[in-house]
């Protein structure tokens, strides 16, 4: 059976955790394929319990599902162990969590360099989370990174860490005037942490492909969003990995022909965290309303998210670069009680109108949104479970977004709970 990729179609924080949780009871595997603990998924169970996950796939909250941290993820061992402990303390069974032997480990020098670099950059900083994600991916590309499997060979691990620290300490001490790290202490701390997770290390590529051959369903769960992709996002204000659908194959070891459905998660308005262009950003009472009503604060950083109206240019772009087959529209309920809801249908750049994503960041920074005004609705829609339960104006809003976004809206979120979802098309049953 083909795999399903679940991706964020904006700048992240679209509600991917809710979508994974909704589908989790009907799949056998959930795989996190990129990123690190620089992003978070919030899942609200039918019991009302709220879980914030940063490294572990959202499927861990569904009994019987095997969860995988794939080779494309960078793992902070301390964060992993704390997250596992937090889940276990709340009665969650984590026995079926596996970790790819080829995932990279985030080391103390990655965090140190990330933090001092951001401070050094000052007003020109990217706005990272300061968790060492970028420096860890830099080492991966430079072929000097530490992989999960290295903890199984202490001698090899020691050689690698000593070589890395020799260079990293030069940077920390001579450029940033910080203290040098002791490689022996780094190794000892890592080996101690590894005792808590090394029994989970596996050849996950082999297991995932065997599962697909056996007819099992694999859900590939991305973090962040399309516009934060290092290749396809608003560079340089991006993450250091590929949250797009193409990254799912690379970060899991599943071939692209194994993927049959790409489910894009799309918020009914737009948000982003950190620096970078944001054409529909609001600085008035409407932005304040979206922030407060949508509870737009980062799961990982706690930072307030920037808020703006829905941007169809971005949605079409996401559909194009990901090959999105279906959209899951989230937080439609947040728009209730607005008299009208503007939707960005295009940009104006130096007097020229376009419906497409600008080729350069310079043009995107100068883009002015061209709005189409849609009528709002006042009804509380949080109890709607069928599309026809929605007020006519809310249905019209969804249908207009569907026309503009480049793919059908198959699911609609009308609240944070798993059950607060309208399913127009079953993306698991009605599949290629």
From Swiss-Prot:
BP term (GO), one: 'de novo' AMP biosynthetic process
GO molecular function terms attached to this record: adenylosuccinate synthase activity; GTP binding; magnesium ion binding
Pathway stated in the Swiss-Prot or TrEMBL entry: Purine metabolism; AMP biosynthesis via de novo pathway; AMP from IMP: step 1/2
Cellular component per GO, a single term: cytoplasm
Residues that hold Mg(2+) according to the record: 13, 40
PROSITE patterns, per database record: ADENYLOSUCCIN_SYN_1 (PS01266), ADENYLOSUCCIN_SYN_2 (PS00513)
Residues given in the record as GTP binding sites: 12-18, 40-42, 305, 331-333, 413-415
InterPro entries noted in UniProt: Adenylosuccin_syn_GTP-bd (IPR018220), Adenylosuccin_syn_Lys_AS (IPR033128), Adenylosuccinate_synth_dom1 (IPR042109), Adenylosuccinate_synth_dom2 (IPR042110), Adenylosuccinate_synth_dom3 (IPR042111), Adenylosuccinate_synthetase (IPR001114), P-loop_NTPase (IPR027417)
SMART domains: Adenylsucc_synt (SM00788)
Keywords assigned: Acetylation, Cytoplasm, GTP-binding, Ligase, Magnesium, Metal-binding, Nucleotide-binding, Purine biosynthesis
A Pfam family hit: Adenylsucc_synt
Catalyzed reactions: IMP + L-aspartate + GTP = N(6)-(1,2-dicarboxyethyl)-AMP + GDP + phosphate + 2 H(+)
Compartments where found: Cytoplasm
Keyword NADP in record: no
Keyword Glycoprotein among record annotations: no
Cofactor: Mg(2+)
Enzyme Commission number(s): 6.3.4.4
Cofactor note: Binds 1 Mg(2+) ion per subunit.
Residues binding IMP, per UniProt: 13-16, 38-41, 129, 143, 224, 239, 303
Active-site residues (renumbered): 13 (proton acceptor), 41 (proton donor)
Binding, substrate: 299-305
Subunit composition and interactions: Homodimer.
Similarity comment text for this entry: Belongs to the adenylosuccinate synthetase family.
Function: Plays an important role in the de novo pathway of purine nucleotide biosynthesis. Catalyzes the first committed step in the biosynthesis of AMP from IMP.
Record protein name field: Adenylosuccinate synthetase
Designated gene of the protein: purA
């Amino acid at each position: 059976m083909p795999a399903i990729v679940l991706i964020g179609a904006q700048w992240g924080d679209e509600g991917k955790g809710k979508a994974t949780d909704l589908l989790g009871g009907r799949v056998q595997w959930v795989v996190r394929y990129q990123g690190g603990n620089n992003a978070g998924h919030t899942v609200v169970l039918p019991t009302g319990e709220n879980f914030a996950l940063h490294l572990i796939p959202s499927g861990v909250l569904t009994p019987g599902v095997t969860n995988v941290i794939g080779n494309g993820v960078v793992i902070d061992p301390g964060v992993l162990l704390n997250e596992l402990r937090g889940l276990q303390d709340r009665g969650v069974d984590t026995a079926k969590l596996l970790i790819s032997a080829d995932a990279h480990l985030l080391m103390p020098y990655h965090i140190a360099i990330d933090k001092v670099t951001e401070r050094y950059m000052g007003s020109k900083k990217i706005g990272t989370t300061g968790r060492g994600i970028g420096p860890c991916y830099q080492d991966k590309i430079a072929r000097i990174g530490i992989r999960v499997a290295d903890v199984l060979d202490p001698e090899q691990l020691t050689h690698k860490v000593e070589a890395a620290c020799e260079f990293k300490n030069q940077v920390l001490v001579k450029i940033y005037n910080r203290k040098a790290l002791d490689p022996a202490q780094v190794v000892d701390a890592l080996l101690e942490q590894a005792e808590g997770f090394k029994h989970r290390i596996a050849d996950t590529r082999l297991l995932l492909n065997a599962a697909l051959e056996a007819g099992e369903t694999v859900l590939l769960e991305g973090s962040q969003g399309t516009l934060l992709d290092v290749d396809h996002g608003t560079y340089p204000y991006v993450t250091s990995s590929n949250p797009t659908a193409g990254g799912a194959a690379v970060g899991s070891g599943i071939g692209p022909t194994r993927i049959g459905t790409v489910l894009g998660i799309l918020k009914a308005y737009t948000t982003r965290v950190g620096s970078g262009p944001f054409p529909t950003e609001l600085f008035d009472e409407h932005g304040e309303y979206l922030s407060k009503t949508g509870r737009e604060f980062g799961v990982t950083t706690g930072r307030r998210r920037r808020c703006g109206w829905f941007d169809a240019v971005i949605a079409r772009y996401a559909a194009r670069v990901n090959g999105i087959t279906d959209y899951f529209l989230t937080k439609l309920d947040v728009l209730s009680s607005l008299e009208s809801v503007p939707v960005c249908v295009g940009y104006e750049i130096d007097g020229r109108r376009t419906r497409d994503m600008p080729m350069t960041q310079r043009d995107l920074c100068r883009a002015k949104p061209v709005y189409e005004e849609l009528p709002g609705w006042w009804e509380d829609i949080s109890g709607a479970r069928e599309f026809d339960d929605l007020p006519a104006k809310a249905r019209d809003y969804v249908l207009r977004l569907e026309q503009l976004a480049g793919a059908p809206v198959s699911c609609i979120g009308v609240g944070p709970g798993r059950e607060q979802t309208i399913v127009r098309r079953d993306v698991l049953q009605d599949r290629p």
